[in-house]
């Protein structure tokens, strides 16, 4: 179910990159909580929280959270993979990505470090979702559980949101 939800989120986002903003209502039970101002979110299952930059949106859909910029040009999908360990999730990352992104070309071979006291691995590249060319990056964090954050946008769009993205990424912290 998570893979179907992620695929649908990516398909809707790929369409929005070409056609403009898309709105979807959350479906299913959520492991997400928000504050009254809707800018602070937590993914309880993963054990992470984050603060949205002004104008950004978060759409919980069951165990998946899709975060997007105000113009929907950049999207980030958070989910807990089936793998129970950080190392297993990193090892199986290609298989996970290939279920949604086609013609994957990795342009960043990957780096390992820590992010806000969590083990962190990141990589990136290009590919296609439903025939639409995208640039993608993926981050794996070891929080309460392993969480994968897939970020994607049309080529050249990510740079437009670089400052906001840095602010957002620095706000991702472990809870619980």
Model-found features: residue ranges?
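N-terminal "mature-domain start" segment
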Residues: 28-61
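C-terminal segment of classical bacterial N-terminal signal peptides
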Residues: 15-25
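Bacterial N-terminal signal peptides that target proteins for export
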Residues: 1-12, 17
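Conserved polar/disulfide-associated segments of primarily extracytoplasmic proteins
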Residues: 59-149, 155-157
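Solvent-exposed, polar/charged alpha-helical surfaces in well-ordered, non-transmembrane soluble domains
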Residues: 50, 54, 91, 95, ...
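Surface-exposed amphipathic alpha-helical segments
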Residues: 148-176
């Amino acid at each position: 179910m998570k893979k179907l939800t992620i695929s649908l989120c990516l398909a809707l986002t790929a369409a929005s990159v070409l056609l403009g903003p898309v709105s979807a209502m959350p479906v299913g039970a959520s492991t997400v909580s928000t504050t009254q101002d809707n800018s602070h979110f937590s993914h309880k299952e993963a054990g992470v929280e984050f603060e949205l930059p002004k104008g950004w949106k978060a759409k919980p859909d069951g165990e998946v959270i899709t975060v997007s910029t105000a113009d929907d040009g950049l999207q980030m999908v958070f989910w807990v993979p089936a793998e129970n360990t950080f190392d297993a999730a990193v090892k199986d990352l290609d298989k996970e990505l290939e279920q949604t992104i086609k013609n994957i070309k990795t342009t960043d071979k990957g780096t390992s470090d820590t992010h806000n006291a969590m083990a962190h691995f990141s990589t990136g590249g290009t590919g296609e979702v439903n025939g639409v060319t995208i640039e993608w990056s993926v981050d794996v964090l070891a929080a309460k559980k392993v969480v994968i954050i897939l970020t994607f946008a049309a080529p050249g769009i990510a740079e437009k949101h670089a400052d906001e993205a840095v602010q957002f990424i620095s706000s991702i912290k472990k809870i619980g």
